[in-house]
Amino acid sequence: MEAIRVFGPKLGSRLSIRSHTTAFPACKLSRFPLTSFPGKHAHLVLLKATTIPLASGDKENNRKFEKLGPSEWGNQFLFAHVDLSEMDALEREIEALKPKVRDMFMSFKGMKSNKKNLFLIYLLVSLGLAHHFEDEIEESVKGCSQEMVEMMDGENDLYTVSIIFWVFRTYGHNISSDIFNRFKGHNGKFKECLATDAKGILSLYEAAHMGTTTDYILDEALSFTLSYLESLAANGTCKPNLVRRIRNALGLLQNKNVEILVAKEYIRFYEQEEDCDKTILEFSMLNLKFLQLHYLQELKLLTKWYKEQDFESKLPPYYRDRIVELHLATLAYINPKYSRVRIILTMIYTIQIILDDTCDRYASLREVESLAATIERWDHNDHAMEGLPDYLKSVAKFIFHTFQEFEREVSSESGGSYSLKATIEDCKRMMRSNLQLAKWAVTGHLPSFDEYLDVAGVEIAVYFTVAGILLGMENINKKEAYEWLIFRDKLVRAMSTKARLVNDLFGYKDDMRRGYVTNSINCYKKQYGVTEEEAFRKLHQMVADGDKMMNEEFLKPINVPHQVLKAVLDTLRAINICYDNEDGFTRLNGNLKNYITSMYVDL
């Protein structure tokens, strides 16, 4: 059985967990979990930043800061048991079922075959099975797109049209939203009779969120469907499994949610449907169990890695202990072959959160300046860290040692050195932004809204995150992928802006409670002379407009593999679950806690 390598600064000899080489292509398992999207979580600490001398010694112990509790998960996952014989059995069953599902793509005949294939694709995506059939799906979508006119001619079923639209947009085909004009009456509005089709209304609602900046009809569709769905969710006037699905969609849409979380819910919905295919249902349940065990293996290793960093003895208790939450966010990258991506991202997110909490919650301004200079020099030698307080030496060493592990992992790969340098540069950029925010925070300075986003959008670390994804990916042209990333700056800037705004919107009350005034809401209020309520409304609209612009960017021709583009999209999904109506990452509550239980506990 081929092993998945695990690397780590303190793990000594290389550990291994086995990969299942037939059903799930092997990859080298890196060692770190990806948590939530750490950004400027400035909410929960009293900023103390101006008077402490650089080498302050015992004075560090006198600083005032709000300590967040340790992870409530403790060592639970460090000692989790994964039955490898059970995984072997699951693998064999999965391999036996895959050809049967693959044959379904070829079994449909006649003009209706294209529609049936698109419905099958929607089902596979919803059940978390699409990564098993990437080639078949790509070929099928491409073939269907060439017969679009014939396929849609005379099709007046709302559910069918909405699903077809959803699949094409999901796979990067810019099908025109004009196909929904057929559902409008003479008055130019959507027909009220459509409201009797609950599944159709739900599918139109989902399709409406795939819109771009010029898909005005989808704005109308969103307005039309929302009130009906809210009524159905409140009154429960359709089948219970559909009511549950509607409520989930109103909370967090499928195309904005993490695939594995969608799959677990969709299986519950699908098994109660009259047209449920027993083979596909069985496949999806086996696949879900296998993935959960696979992820649990990763989390177990990452928990060990995290414990061995010994932050508890090296740092004051100002940082968030969130290794489980970090790994959960990496599950946005569902494919088992992306173990290395998930592990590297978890380590990068750990770097981000330690840096963020150090600069935002504890360090003096002089210390932040000194740490920034140390990271800018990128000198691993101890003499380069002289003058830093001991706790900052530990922070710097942790970052440098982690990147040394990255270097050992990727240096022999094609493009590995290039991708490593690019990731280091993004780490430096994030640190510079942390320094600028610290300077503003000390004086309570409110820059212009645009200037704030330029700085804070980098600090939220989307660029650093995407660079980490590319660093962890194998069998891609990394130089080409990074150049695409730089060229498509509009896309990544929009992602950064969304992450920044969402972070600030949900963290505003905590920011203000502790006197941290430099945030997007206050900067917008100052620049445009509006009220707090108006600023909130405008920033929420900016988030929605940003989603449209990103949808638009994803539909443009690309010169990189689909897997790279999808990974960027999955990063957005990770952001969404971490800020699902609240900042559940900092406060350890709400949906994020439920997601963890669903993935790692309820096996």
UniProtKB/Swiss-Prot annotation:
MF term (GO), any: terpene synthase activity
Signal peptide: none
Any one GO biological process: diterpenoid biosynthetic process
Binding site for Mg(2+) 1: D356, D360
Cofactor(s) needed for function: Mg(2+); Mn(2+)
GO cellular component entries: cytoplasm
Sequence positions that bind Mg(2+) 2: D356, D360
The protein's name: Terpenoid synthase 28
Organism: Arabidopsis thaliana
